[in-house]
Amino acid sequence: MSKDIKSVEHSPKIHQRNDPQHVNDRTFFIDASNQSLTAIPLEIFTFTELEEVHLENNQIEEIPQEIQRLKNIRVLYLDKNNLRSLCPALGLLSSLESLDLSYNPIFSSSLVVVSFLHALRELRLYQTDLKEIPVVIFKNLHHLELLGLTGNHLKCLPKEIVNQTKLREIYLKRNQFEVFPQELCVLYTLEIIDLDENKIGAIPEEIGHLTGLQKFYMASNNLPVLPASLCQCSQLSVLDLSHNLLHSIPKSFAELRKMTEIGLSGNRLEKVPRLICRWTSLHLLYLGNTGLHRLRGSFRCLVNLRFLDLSQNHLHHCPLQICALKNLEVLGLDDNKIGQLPSELGSLSKLKILGLTGNEFLSFPEEVLSLASLEKLYIGQDQGFKLTYVPEHIRKLQSLKELYIENNHLEYLPVSLGSMPNLEVLDCRHNLLKQLPDAICQAQALKELRLEDNLLTHLPENLDSLVNLKVLTLMDNPMEEPPKEVCAEGNEAIWKYLKENRNRNIMATKIQAWWRGTMVQRGFGKFGELLKPQKKGKTSPKDKKGKKDVKGKPGKGKKK
């Protein structure tokens, strides 16, 4: 269930858009994004009272001098274009508060223009191939609250960044930092620091000076230890330390009483740190691939937990402590050594997503059928034992939307799948299916049906009645009806074939019925007898006792 169990997600605030009902000379907002524009329409500059302009995701190559007419503009989004340089007129927008130039191949030297935007509060320069930032930006701008520099080639920050005394959020993910930017430790207004996916080997003790820090992202670095001073960041609620080199967490972290989310996946902990069980306010806990064999008894105290990732560990059974977490909505147990689930699992009445892929179940774990709120079930067995059946009782999961049962040895699917009104995704890839139940055509909510690498030769003739089905995959099946060449053309060709084949069958039935009726009218037999199929080589008449005439001899009581 990799798309549900993942590292801590976060993103900077996105400015709210309110599309105007009318466009006139007093329009305050224009959205011209996603229009394949190669230039900014000059008509935009006639709306002199514009406050917000969205031009992202186009092919714009330059900003015209006419931009200076927009004296009142506060928000300008130009991300995902082809800008290489910025015109000097951009620096005349004295009211501009939010500027997004992300995903443009901008020359860093042209960014000097930005230093004239003295009202700027938000500057986003994600993935612009920057190796350095013009120092003058940090010298001249004093109101920055958000600075986005993710996905560049930065190795350090200019010392002048300490002038940003109002900075609250800084995003430096996926750069080339090997040393933690010490300058950040004097920016006391910082609330969010994102340094994921760098090569940082240590966090300085001075991090404790940031007492207002709320979210700290340090995943995918080279941290072997953590500074005890981090416990002084008393407002810290989100901490992502996934995929580092940690073996333990400082005991002083127990003082972080506002923790709601922590990521520790991909570290060599081998056991759950005792202090984590004291963070009873935790909502999300990532412990995947940490070498765990068991959970502490006190783990049951995490009663507010909604998301728990225990995937890729060494668990031989589903810990009973989990069954006490009544608010749990997502549980990842993938890639362990679990062979059986406890009957108490049904107490997780709010569970919506359950990952069991890659375990050691000998048969389908029917304990999951008591999870009435379950919406997604992952039970593909890409390693170890293979499941040979899915029980008909699967219909008990009436809330189920997605079922992933790939990489098993299933030869058939339960008919009851057709009575699951909310089923949208059914993944049966890499099994031994020889046919689909006709009842599958009743699963009207179905949007994706993945059937690659099975033994299918035919599809149900009414499969085209699934009007919501958008994805149907049939590669690596010995298909005959429809033929492989039809299947290769996609859904539309398959639906057309099924419809035409169905019409042919209806016509054949009508012709057969007409022929039989005609034969009866002409006295060639009773209608019921004509309906009986005749076997090859068994057409000789029988006597009253049911015995056939012997060839060359008359039947008993008959004259030769």
UniProtKB/Swiss-Prot annotation:
The keyword Signal does not apply. Keywords: Leucine-rich repeat, Repeat. Residues 504-533 form the IQ domain. One of its GO terms (cellular component) is cytoplasm. Residues 533-560 have a biased composition (Basic residues). SMART domains: LRR_BAC (SM00364), LRR_TYP (SM00369). Residues 1-20, 529-560 are annotated as: Disordered. LRR repeats lie at residues 23-47, 48-70, 72-95, 97-116, 117-140, 141-164, 166-187, 188-210, 212-233, 234-256, 258-281, 283-301, 302-325, 326-348, 350-371, 374-397, 398-422, 424-443, 444-466, 468-489. It comes from the Eukaryota. The keyword Ribonucleoprotein does not apply. This is Leucine-rich repeat and IQ domain-containing protein 4. It comes from Homo sapiens. The lineage of its organism: Eukaryota, Metazoa, Chordata, Craniata, Vertebrata.
